[in-house]
Amino acid sequence: ISQWGYDFRPAYLKIAEIRELLPGVPVLALTATATPEVVKDIQSRLNFREENVFRMSFERKNLAYIVRKTDNKTGELLHILKRIDGSAIIYVRNRRRTKEITELLMQEGITADFYHAGLDNAVKDLRQKRWQSGEVRVMVATNAFGMGIDKPDVRFVVHYNMPKNMESYYQEAGRAGRDGEPAECILYYAPIDNRTNRFLIENGEENEELDAITKQIVMERDWERLRQMTFYCYTKECLRHYILNYFGEQTL
């Protein structure tokens, strides 16, 4: 739900209508990432009349958050893969680059596969199983590689491109180190990432079903979230504290 902010997916709004028809049925809303503002939206739009919220800390003490500003992302990526052993996920923005980077890694002797929404389901399942089993070390993927991914020994997650918002970044980076052992979350940033994300926000197809006024509200919200994501790439403060503060958690 938090990925859609104020409007959510239109189908989610039907839940409130169903709740009116079935007032005695308990309802539990779950999300991995939600700012305090989005929590209030969920309560309001899904007709939770009593404030009854349980939150776990966003802090993952075993994760090291790193931002590298570079115009040589591929060189940096090869360096980190050769420096650190273990399973990895590399998130990239588009499907074409998943294949290109995979081929490059294979040429360097690093076992890798690519994954995106355009592949047949059977192919996606096979590649995920090969990666889960350790037969393949690195999965190069778009954000389609997300739901249900729970491999405990991922030693690092690399974002080859800056995501459009902190919610996406936190969820994807959080696939590292689920076994509690040290892991690294590395974001490679170049100024073109910000320009590309602005273009995607302004020309995105996911909001085409919305009316003009709502579409403008959603676009302005997405610009603000992109601004917060860009600040993360430039901040001099502790990145862990930045993440915790973004999600409304107090830090010392």
Role assignments for model-derived ranges:
Residues 1-213, 224, 249-251:
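Helicase motor core with emphasis on the C-terminal RecA-like subdomain
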